[in-house]
Amino acid sequence: AIINMGQKDLLIDCQGNWGDVRTGDGAAAPRYIEARLNKFALNIAFNKQTTLWQKSYDGRKNEPTTLPLKFPLLLAHGVEGIAVGLSTKIMPHNFIDLIKGSIKILEGKNATIFPDFQTGGQVDVSDYQDGRRGGRIKIRATIMEKSKNTIAIKDVPYGVTTGSLIDSIL
């Protein structure tokens, strides 16, 4: 989980080889990487006005009971999970779009946001359904033919690595 969060470059200051979502390269072993929350994460998660604290199990330290964030982190990072009788997949959204959408909602206006992907690609959101059950999105690559023997791939679809794309072409 921490590798996934660190690769998104939003909450974690990363040190070491964290891998690359574009190429599919894995991260180094945990003993070779370091992580700490960045200033943004500390501000949105550990805010004195929104975070409730309780004593730890041995009473020596305080720990948060919950982390009510001041930012829609699930939408920014995206998440996928299953449980008994249900499943979900929330695609990642653009940071700036989320800030602008949050401001609109706080102003009492409607906001429309769509998924945005770190690796690029085109997305068809005609059946997105604003998060309601059954919505779908289609993700496509941008491929241009430069010559008879050469193609240029401008964007790679979300979830596809350059390594797996090369393997599928060869």
Describe each PLM feature range.
Residues A1-G134:
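Catalytic phosphate-handling regions of large nucleic-acid enzymes and associated NTPases
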Residues R136-L170:
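Gly/Lys-enriched N-terminal cap/neck module of very large, oligomeric protein machines
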